[in-house]
Swiss-Prot record:
Official protein name in the record: Tryptophan 2,3-dioxygenase
Function field: Heme-dependent dioxygenase that catalyzes the oxidative cleavage of the L-tryptophan (L-Trp) pyrrole ring and converts L-tryptophan to N-formyl-L-kynurenine. Catalyzes the oxidative cleavage of the indole moiety.
Residues where substrate binds: 57-61, 128, 328
EC number, as in UniProt: 1.13.11.11
Xref: Gene3D superfamilies: 1.10.287.3810, 1.20.58.480
Length: 380
């Protein structure tokens, strides 16, 4: 069957043959398939003991690395748009589109794990000896993805050494890693963007003050309702629960408490950025906040899918080598990988926790006419 993009489907059609003076390259030349398809070197075959499943192992990991490259390409373009001194809001749709593309790529990567699992532990053992000292820990591109997303060095789980030491004397890899640590991450750029959310101005709509007043009124109404509870034990339980909720809200209204949580690593956003994220969540139906809300949702999707990919990888490793063996690169294998599933690797943790601070729709501060016009007309 001929390629549907190569012409009218007639293999003997002379018009499908590129003329010698035409500009451009044929399919294989354009994609450099001679290099791509010749990059599968089975060490078991070189050792005159070919193991069939080593080919699958190589292909799958090469496919991962190609998709990692595309994710980095998308992240860099998004970071460039967000890093502008004045962000062009007409670019928001393009940012959303590219983030969605990353989400779809990550879904594909998650779905690739079951293909590797068609290989049994015994099949893997047949060629595992050829892999050392190679390790997935040495995937420079995955480290770049983590850094460009916003994983902090101090948040990383340490196993035997600093994560960049595995690249040894590879100057190019080390330089790329260093640059990714210095450059503003997606987390930092999104934080700056959220800090400029319209409606946070203290001399304007002052959303944060209005939100705090709404929370106080909401909780006071709950206290009043609890006091009318005829059963003393039930009343005390409700009052205790309300007080716990008041403490939770205090953690976002008290700047000092918030900063302490950031310092401890339990929060990532600045206080102002958290305010912006909460405001966008409440007023996401307003035209100006519709795409920003989609953007925040996609960032959570990316975090979720990376966590899911890590989890699937952990389970696969446990199935293949168990939980006690060392990884081929010298790490603790399963134990190390399992430790990366914690919230310390979740970059946009604050977005996941926004639901903690929601209040009923009827309690959300109503928009006044000036801010409503501002949120309808982007040019205001």
């Amino acid at each position: 069957m001929s390629c549907p993009y190569a012409g009218n489907g007639n293999e003997h059609d002379d018009s499908a043959v590129p003329l010698s003076n035409e500009i451009g390259k044929i399919y294989g030349e354009y994609l450099m398939l001679d290099k791509v398809l010749d990059a599968q070197c089975m060490l078991s075959k070189e050792d005159k003991r070919p193991v069939h499943d080593e080919h699958l192992f190589i292909i799958t990991h090469q496919a991962y690395e190609l998709w990692f490259k595309q994710i980095i390409f998308e992240f860099d373009s998004i970071r460039d748009m967000l890093n502008a001194e004045v962000i062009d809001e007409t670019k928001t749709l393009e940012i959303v589109k590219r983030l969605n593309r990353v989400v779809l790529i990550l879904k594909l990567l998650v779905d690739q794990v079951p293909i590797l699992e068609t290989m049994t532990p015994l099949d893997f053992m047949d060629f595992r000896k050829y892999l050392a000292p190679a390790s997935g820990f040495q995937s420079m591109q995955f480290r770049l993805i983590e850094n460009k997303l916003g994983v902090l060095t101090e948040q990383r789980v340490k196993y035997n050494q600093k994560y960049s030491d595995v690249f040894g004397n590879d100057a190019q890899a080390l330089n790329a890693i260093r640059n990714s640590e210095i450059e503003p991450s997606l987390l930092e750029l999104v934080q700056r963007w959220l800090e400029r959310t319209p409606g946070l101005e203290e001399d304007g709509f002052n959303f944060w003050q209005k939100f705090q007043q709404s929370v106080d009124q909401f909780l006071d109404a709950q206290v009043q309702s609890a006091m009318e509870e005829p059963v003393e034990q039930a009343k005390n339980y409700r009052l205790m629960d309300i007080e716990k909720r008041r403490e939770v809200y205090r953690s976002i209204f008290d700047t000092a408490v918030h900063e302490a949580l950031v310092k401890r690593g339990d929060r990532r956003f600045s206080h102002r950025a958290l305010q912006g994220a909460i405001m966008i969540t409440f007023y996401r139906d307003e035209p100006r906040f519709s795409q920003p809300h989609q953007l925040l949702t996609l960032l959570m999707d990316i975090d979720s899918l990376i966590t899911k990919w890590r989890y699937n990888h952990v389970i696969m490793v446990q199935r293949m080598i168990g939980s006690q063996q060392l990884g081929t690169g010298g790490s603790s294998g399963y134990q190390y990988l399992r430790s990366t599933l914690s919230d310390r690797y979740k970059v946009f943790l604050d977005l996941f926790n926004l639901s903690t601070f929601l209040i009923p729709r009827e309690a959300i501060p109503p928009l006044d006419e000036s801010i409503r016009k501002k949120l309808i007309n982007k040019s205001v």
